[in-house]
Amino acid sequence: MIKVKLLKNGNDLKKIVIKGHAMYDDFGKDIVCAAVSSTVITSVNACLSIDDKSISYEEGDGIVINVIKNDYVTSKIIDNMISNLFELEKAYPKNVQIKEENNE
């Protein structure tokens, strides 16, 4: 299962952690994993191409996105990414899980 954790401080999104494999199909044939990956990578690239200091990210056992700037454009791109991930969670609840944590 792909697990997405949205870490907020109040209303501000600070970090997104994405780990796991969807297990929808074999490696290389998994459309759910491909959808999550393309959504996330496209969003990361869009943020960085507009402002390379808007976010930072680390790849390893998954991907960790740190939101540095919550400006209008960055927020819209990240909100769109999250909306797409929620749609994938609705369509594939056995393969994608999203949790939100608030550290106010």
Which residues does each PLM region occupy?
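N-terminal intrinsically disordered, cationic/polar leader segments
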Residues: 1-31, 41, 45-104
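Short, conserved glycine- and acidic-residue-centered signature motifs
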Residues: 32-36
